[in-house]
Amino acid sequence: KAILEGEDYFPLLNHISGTRTLVSIYRPADGSRWDEVVTPISQGRLNTLLYKRWVKQRAADVERLSGGRLGYVHIESMADGSFRTMYADILGKYNHCDGIVIDTRFNGGGRMHEDIEILFSGEKYLTQVVRGKEACDMPSRRWNKASIMITCEANYSNAHGTPWVYQKMGIGKVVGMPVPGTMTSVSWERLQDQTLVFGIPV
């Protein structure tokens, strides 16, 4: 189907996510024509790609502004997957850094305040030396150096509770915009109709 100038072509891409699609392109400036095969993606996939790009940009900003002294992690949600990504990053590619920026902005919550408190409250008690060379600090599975946490108005539920615990325990400074105080605890219940799930505040 030809797409006329000014025509909305989005409807042509509906319901073909993941399907290889032939697109014929015409360049009026020089009269050239060519074909490209593309694979449309869903809105969800697009959002994921945009999020990953945003995180990379923030990490690059922190590296540039700190001269490579600080690392950067964003906690997308207070859930296992986000924790594993953060854990791998801080003890992996950022292990050499002097400090870490923990970004919790736009986090919708979950339950991870205790895990984050434990992870970032490490205190060095020895340095392991192997054959005269320093190998690692202990504890080796917690962050023993400086950290700072960023918040914003879009933090919700446990993304309010986590910065509160971080500040209450004196782990580091909390900076950014105020969190609206939305910390809640919810019990998820199913009744006779198992397709219905109710979040009951406790």
Describe the residue ranges of each PLM region.
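Short, intrinsically disordered, charge-balanced linker/junction segments flanking boundaries
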Residues: 200-202
